[in-house]
A protein has these predicted regions:
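Active-site-proximal loop/helix segment associated with metal-binding centers of metalloenzymes
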Residues: 65-71, 77, 159-192
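Cap/insert and terminal regions of metallo-dependent hydrolase folds
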Residues: 201-290
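Active-site neighborhood of phospho(di)ester-bond hydrolases with catalytic His/Asp-centered motifs
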Residues: 58-59, 96-105, 125-128, 195-201, ...
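Pre-active-site segment of Zn-dependent metallo-hydrolases
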Residues: 29-31, 54-101, 112-115, 167-171, ...
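Beta-strand-turn-beta hairpins that frame and shape the catalytic cleft
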Residues: 31-37, 50-56, 149-158, 188-195, ...
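Active-site environment of divalent metal-dependent phosphoester hydrolases
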Residues: 64-65, 105-110, 132-134, 150-151, ...
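Gram-negative bacterial Sec-dependent N-terminal signal peptides
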Residues: 1-22
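Active-site HxH/HxHxD metal-binding segment of metal-dependent hydrolases
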Residues: 67-70, 87-149, 161-166
Length: 296
């Protein structure tokens, strides 16, 4: 089954080296006020993360509004994706990018437009060899598997786990296969804040473990609460998980992304803003609009 196209899959259902600075420890030099981590919300789950002079592009979906059919057997599948246009051109999005991280190859994280826009020799990290082989077959020549951790441009990136849906969903083989695997990533550099990008996962023990092990000061959650037809649970996080993250990492800033851009997201930014205000955690949670940048 070709994991590049989630719509088809759902219709069926219903390298790595560590530098001395990082060796042997997850405890790094305390953040320096002059060392800023920059995060730009591009659209959907696509974000740019910069540690100093090193910039990563995460999960690029760069197509024009309405390019693809809605994901079949999901919430609002009659709508075409993406729901909105980018705030800047794909050329502007990829400008200054040093490496790409594809947490998994579902269409809303790795699409044809991204494949067309990106240089074929750009360093690109995937979660496993299956995804790496797919992306190599698309013409990319510098694809690396993030089996555990790696160092790139002075930044340590570490793979974390999760599950892209509920146990009920994964008990159905025809659904478990297309949902597949998806990774999260922890970013660390001496003197900079640690950032944990959870990826397409629901709240699992792996999320707790990542927070306990790495003590992130910034946590990026895919919080659009994507829903499938016929199932109660979501396939990514939602508002209650944003609250849970704020409780699990009491000193961290929470950034909510993967919202308002593809059909099966059931939680809007406005609804999440109302929720976090009701919970009294609005000062802890950033919900950036497309194109907006944050500095940590």
């Amino acid at each position: 089954m070709n994991l590049r196209t989630l719509p088809l899959a759902l219709s069926i259902a219903c390298a790595a080296a560590t530098t001395t600075a990082f060796a042997g420890s997850n405890v790094l030099k305390a953040p320096d006020a002059s060392h800023k981590v920059d995060l730009q919300q591009i659209r959907n789950a696509t974000v740019k993360i910069s540690y100093g002079a090193t910039t990563f592009l995460i999960d690029p979906m760069l197509a024009k509004k309405g390019t693809y059919p809605g994901f079949e057997n999901t919430y609002r599948s009659n709508l075409r994706n993406p729901l909105v246009d980018l705030t800047e051109s794909p050329t502007e999005v990829i400008s200054g990018v040093d490496a790409v991280i594809v947490t998994h190859t579902h269409l809303d994280h790795w699409d044809d437009a991204a494949q067309k826009a990106l240089p074929k020799d750009i360093p690109l990290f995937t979660q496993h060899e299956e995804d790496a082989q797919l992306i190599r077959s698309q013409g990319f020549k510098n694809v690396r598997v993030l089996t555990d951790e790696a160092e790139f441009g002075g930044v340590k990136i570490t793979k974390t786990g999760g599950q892209h849906g509920t146990d009920e969903m994964y008990a159905v083989p025809a659904l478990a296969k297309p949902l597949g695997e998806a990774m999260g990533v922890v970013f660390q550099a001496p003197g900079y804040k640690t950032l944990y990008l959870a990826g397409d996962t629901i709240w699992r023990k792996e999320v707790d473990q990542a927070i306990e092990q790495y003590h992130p000061e910034v946590i990026v959650l895919n919080a659009g609460k994507a829903k499938m037809t016929g199932y109660e649970g979501a396939i990514i996080m939602g508002e209650e998980d944003v609250l849970r993250a704020s409780q699990a990492a009491k000193n961290a800033k929470i950034v909510a992304v993967h919202m308002d851009a593809v059909n099966h997201m059931s939680l809007t930014r406005e609804e999440l803003r109302t929720y976090v205000k009701k919970q009294g955690i609005e000062s802890r949670v950033d919900i950036p609009e497309d194109g907006a940048s944050l500095e940590f």
